[in-house]
Amino acid sequence: MATSAEAPAKEAQKRDSQPQKQKRETQDEAELLTVPDGWKEPAFSKEDNPRGLLEESSFATLFPKYREAYLKECWPLVQKALNEHHVKATLDLIEGSMTVCTTKKTFDPYIIIRARDLIKLLARSVSFEQAVRILQDDVACDIIKIGSLVRNKERFVKRRQRLIGPKGSTLKALELLTNCYVMVQGNTVSAIGPFSGLKEVRKVVLDTMKNIHPIYNIKTLMIKRELAKDSELRSQSWERFLPQFKHKNVNKRKEPKKKSVKKEYTPFPPPQPESQIDKELASGEYFLKASQKKRQKMEAIKAKQAEALTKRQEERNKAFIPPKEKPAVKPKEASTETKIDVAAIKEKVKKAKTKKLGALTAEEVKLKMEADEKKQKRKK
């Protein structure tokens, strides 16, 4: 029999053991949620489905005219790759279509979906070497339609070129960061790679079509890649490390030249305009007799006529008004104060007399004589 002193001690031990069990359970759950590095899902073999499939499944897709020559050349390789998984592939050059269908030997139920993706990628100008990777278990594909995202054709071409970058540098950087193969062709972007990479590629492509430059997303991907290497930061939030970009281009609305100032809102309707009878009542004309009204009208007409007559007379009289003459400017009298240097003028006249017209100056004569002497020396 247990004593009364031992009972509380056992209860205390139970209480201590409960949080330890909870911690272990949470640790086990965390270990289950995290996928260990280098782990691969076991491949689907014939032993998993020995009886095969019950019904035949098939998929077909059309391809453009310019892909006909390439598909005709690489079709034996496509058939060889699909025959390994017991899938039949046919190429119809007349109709311009590719078809894949399961056979009685097909054991993998999902291989037909991968074969469908293979022919879709081949139709979207992806090379056979890259498209055949879709048959692997850890590889997926995503065909992003970008044609309907931008209305203006010129703007669409510019944004698509921005995604490719100068000499394909932006696309190459995106491929290295996401471990995906990306192919931009026409109105679609085809991507092949792991699921995590495809998610990032789709985000970058859609953001580029929404006029967000891909360099911003590439920068965040580079930071995420470096943070993933740190084991401590793996389980933490990365928001504080990621850059926050501000939109610089603000849509400025064109303001009108004439701004109409809105009146203050009043719940009451505007006052009713005065009628002719109201005006007559206010002035007292309403109570006058017909003869008095007629007399007033005639007086108003005569006053108007008199005003018009005076105006007309003023306009006629304007023609007879002489224009204003400019004030006469008096000629300036020659000032007697200005002194003339007579001696300087005499010297100038003497020099002019001694000098012949077209004669050389003393300096010019010296230079000419020196030049003649040099010529004579050379001749000797």
Curated annotation (Swiss-Prot):
Biased composition (Basic residues): 249-261
GO CC terms of this entry: chromosome; intercellular bridge; nucleolus; nucleoplasm; small-subunit processome
Family, per entry: Belongs to the KRR1 family.
SUPFAM superfamilies: Eukaryotic type KH-domain (KH-domain type I)
PTM-bearing positions, type Phosphoserine: 4
Keyword Nuclease: no
Biased composition (Basic and acidic residues): 8-27
GO terms, biological process: ribosomal small subunit biogenesis; rRNA processing
Residues joined by cross-link Glycyl lysine isopeptide (Lys-Gly) (interchain with G-Cter in SUMO2): 23, 339, 368
Function: Part of the small subunit (SSU) processome, first precursor of the small eukaryotic ribosomal subunit. During the assembly of the SSU processome in the nucleolus, many ribosome biogenesis factors, an RNA chaperone and ribosomal proteins associate with the nascent pre-rRNA and work in concert to generate RNA folding, modifications, rearrangements and cleavage as well as targeted degradation of pre-ribosomal RNA by the RNA exosome.
Coiled-coil parts of chain: none
Gene Ontology molecular function: RNA binding
Keywords: Isopeptide bond, Nucleus, Phosphoprotein, Ribonucleoprotein, Ribosome biogenesis, RNA-binding, rRNA processing, Ubl conjugation
UniProt protein name: KRR1 small subunit processome component homolog
Protein's cellular compartments: Nucleus, Nucleolus
Residues of the KH domain: 153-205
Lineage: Eukaryota, Metazoa, Chordata, Craniata, Vertebrata
Disulfide bonds: none
Location of the region described as Disordered in the Swiss-Prot/TrEMBL record: 1-32, 249-279, 307-336
Assembly and oligomerization: Part of the small subunit (SSU) processome, composed of more than 70 proteins and the RNA chaperone small nucleolar RNA (snoRNA) U3.
